[in-house]
Amino acid sequence: MMAVLTGLTLLAGVGCTKPIQGSAQPDPDAPLTQVSEDGYGLTAGFADAPVQIEIFAEPQCSHCADLQRDVGDGLAHYIGLGQLAVTYRPMTFLDTGDLGYSARVSNALFVAASQPDSPAVAFQRFVEALWADQDPSGRGPDDDEIAEKAGAAGLPEDVVGRIARGETAVDTVEMDAANYDLLYLVDPMYTGTPTVYNLNTDETVDIYDADWLDKLMSSA
């Protein structure tokens, strides 16, 4: 009897599973990432999401890293629910010498966004990872290191490979100039990063309010 019970216990603990062939497939209904119409922004989320914001950011900006640390999870959550679309507008004004740190990171973001099947939540996680591991005024991550972060964030293998190869996806000089001009238009008094702009109300967001994201989402 003990042997029978032991066998039953083992069966209950292990259970029966049906082998699944192949790899997990992305949700066809999940929000994706794309390059904005003007060519210099990166939009993560549905085009018809009820809340639309722009975030002006510099890859070496420590305050931008603080922003991602504080609300990165929240941004990913609302993007995944289809309630929020975030358009990132990278800038490179902290680049010095020939290192091209901010330009390299910005280009990698455009590589990811230009891939038709890049999941928006994975893109947001990629952004968080890049800003969480900064090297201000240093060399910054190389293409292989950036590609590793892209893979860990869940971006497609094609994106990871293109980043690792150093594929060019945007003219970062033109990108920086265009996004600076746009930042000046939305907030001529403070042309710094991070700046969050509410596209629904045409107003800058007070990101020093600890509950700004929740308030923004509840107002939609």
Question: What name fits each language-model region?
Answer:
Residues 1-97, 174-181, 215-220:
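Extracytoplasmic thiol/disulfide redox context detector
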Residues 6, 54, 136, 150, ...:
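Short, flexible active-site loop motifs that bind/organize anionic cofactors or intermediates
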Residues 19-21, 25, 151-220:
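C-terminal cap of thioredoxin/glutaredoxin-like
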Residues 36-42, 110-114, 160:
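Short acidic/polar alpha-helix capping motifs at helix-coil junctions
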Residues 46-50, 72, 108-109, 155-160:
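A broad, low-specificity signal for short, low-complexity segments enriched in glycine/proline
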Residues 65-143:
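Structural alpha/beta surface segment adjacent to cysteine/selenocysteine redox centers
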Residues 118-121, 144-151, 158-162:
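Surface-exposed, polar/charged faces of alpha-helical domains
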